[in-house]
Amino acid sequence: MIVSYQDMSAEPELANILQGLADETSTHKDVIYHVQRNQNARKSLAPTELLLNMTLLVTAGSETISSVLVTFMYNLCIHRDVYERLATMIRITFADPSDITLQELEGLVYFDACIKEALRIFPPVSSNLPREVPAKGAQVGPHFLPGGMLVSVAPWAAVRSKDNFHLPNEYHPERWLRNHPEHGWDPAFENDKLSASTPFGAGPKQCMGQNLSYYEIRLIVAHLLWVFDFELETEGVEGEKNRLWSLDPHFGLLRSFQTLNRPDLYIRFQERAGI
């Protein structure tokens, strides 16, 4: 009865929200407004489908990006050799932050390796992404999976497994430079199974916005590296809170509810002298 009552109470509010999103006179036309008016769509979405898609868009379109940015910045702060190399690269490549473009950033192989390693070591969606086995079933290695079964891989377990990665709990962008030895490939990572890191999912239903995610991460971090010098806060209350990121259970545990429930991160920023 309690669940039924909650559902009944939510329905009028949901109807009001959807009506507001469909308001033709509104000056703010968001993505749901345009989805509902797509003339090429086979049919409009039902209220429940709209609600599920709004939840997905908010989670995938904002929460994951902010998680990647925070974890990337954390790893740059604690791996000063990576920070110095990447900051020097950005500052030499671009004479002014206004010169920073996606086209130029895409050519920075080491920068991409740093991003991929940040996505690996702290996958923004660290809980399972279920997939349904086709009706005829599927053979996965020695195992036959019957049709209709839901299967998934735990991203955090996959990327932290020694079966898949050498030094799995350490941040090493070099592992992603196998095809670019001139940029510092380390043979110690020869046997890494890079395909085990799937931060955007895998197969035909992987995240359709992953390219946009890479664009946003490249642009934001490149501008931060060009304009600022920064380091992790290690003193006081903020420094104490930053210790949660070490994954040392003595300082507390990270939690994940579909996406990473990241703790606060405290960084000291100082504008570079002479710019």
Predicted stretch roles:
Residues R80-Y83, D192-K193, Q206, Q210-S256:
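Cytochrome P450 heme-binding "Cys pocket" and the immediately downstream C-terminal segment
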Residues F257-I275:
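C-terminal helix/juxtamembrane-tail motif
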Residues I2-V68:
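Conserved cytochrome P450 catalytic core segment spanning the I/J/K helices
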Residues E49, N53-L56, S62, Q139-F144, ...:
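C-terminal, well-structured subdomains that either form a transmembrane helix-short loop-helix hairpin
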Residues A41-P47, E182, D186-P199:
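Active-site-adjacent bridging/hinge elements
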Residues T64-C77, I220:
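Short, small-residue alpha-helix embedded
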Residues S26-K29, C77-V125, G141, P146-M149, ...:
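Cytochrome P450 I-helix active-site segment
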